Swiss-Prot record:
TM region positions: 34-54, 94-114, 115-135, 143-163, 171-191, 218-238, 244-264
Natural source organism: Janthinobacterium sp. (strain Marseille)
Domain of life: Bacteria
Keywords annotated in UniProt: ATP synthesis, Cell inner membrane, Cell membrane, CF(0), Hydrogen ion transport, Ion transport, Membrane, Transmembrane, Transmembrane helix, Transport
Protein name: ATP synthase subunit a
GO BP, one annotated term: proton motive force-driven plasma membrane ATP synthesis
Any one GO cellular component localisation term in the record: plasma membrane
Keyword set includes Cell membrane: yes
């Protein structure tokens, strides 16, 4: 007897898992009316987990011999604070906690990539929601909309600190006068606008590209395991294990790089040309 639903091909499987649970189908390359609900949900979820993580660390903090959890959190806080001290020369009252927030949040969002790729598809099918939630992606940083949103937040902070430190007049003067003098004001303005845009776009694209590639490789490994052969299953287990171990480095390295670039860009606001 024929089955009701034929098994998807490899390309259909990948395309399905790279789709988003959105407010509507995307027909154009750029459509600001579309909201990826899965990206928003998992971003908030990672943020809540991060806040709970730090709250528990603060609650359990002791001046005596720290436990493993407190020691791990203290290592992260000290690492971030040392990086902030070496990069930002000025008041770091807000910047160091900001960098810590960025690192923990991005690391947690990246870590969602370790969840099995078919886990939520199977869950939605089991509870009868597969007809409503036809697509679902778990990793917010594998969505360019998510990384661009964070990068735009960093861009807003760059502008804020430039105005706060140099004053509105000083910031505008720097836009027109640096780096080649006021006589080349139009060229200076264009160059500075390109610099701000390049920083924002590259910050978003770097994180997105690495996490998207990692997610795609996990899908390919899952396809390898779906082959009905002993070799396919063995290759799936070996490749999946090795890539998951290597991906741990990528997850936290990308969070560290994003945090460092955030510090560098905000730290540049404390300097004048």
């Amino acid at each position: 007897m024929a089955t009701d639903h034929a098994a998807p091909t490899a390309s259909e499987y990948i395309v399905h898992h790279l789709g988003h649970f959105s407010t509507k189908h995307q027909d154009k390359i750029v459509d600001f009316s579309i909201i990826n609900m899965d990206t928003i949900f998992w971003s908030i979820f990672a943020g809540v987990v991060g806040c709970l993580f730090m709250y528990l660390a603060a609650r359990k903090a002791t001046s005596g011999v720290p436990g493993r959890f407190q020691a791990a959190v203290e290592m992260i806080v000290e690492m971030v604070d040392n990086q902030a001290k070496s990069i930002v020369h000025g008041d770091r009252t807000f910047i160091a906690p900001l960098a810590l927030t960025v690192f923990v949040w991005v690391a947690l969002m990246n870590s969602l990539d370790f969840l099995p790729v078919d886990m939520f598809s199977a869950f939605f099918h089991a509870v009868g929601l597969d007809s409503l939630i036809t697509h679902h992606r778990v990793v917010p940083t594998a969505d360019l909309n998510g990384t661009m949103g964070i990068a735009l937040g960093v861009f807003a902070l760059m502008i804020f600190y430039n105005i706060k430190i140099k004053g509105a007049g000083g910031f505008v003067h720097e836009l027109f006068a640096a780096p080649f003098g006021i006589w080349l004001a139009p060229f200076n303005l264009l160059l500075n606008m390109i610099e701000f845009a390049a920083k924002t776009v590259s910050l978003a694209m770097r994180l997105f590209g690495n996490m998207y590639a990692g997610e795609l490789l996990f899908l390919l490994i899952a396809l390898l395991g779906s082959t009905a052969t002993a070799f396919g299953f063995f290759g799936h287990v070996v490749a999946g294990t090795l890539w998951a171990i290597f991906h741990i480095l990528i997850v936290f390295l990308q969070a560290f790089i994003f945090m460092m670039l955030t510090l560098v860009y905000i730290g540049q606001a404390h300097e004048s040309h």
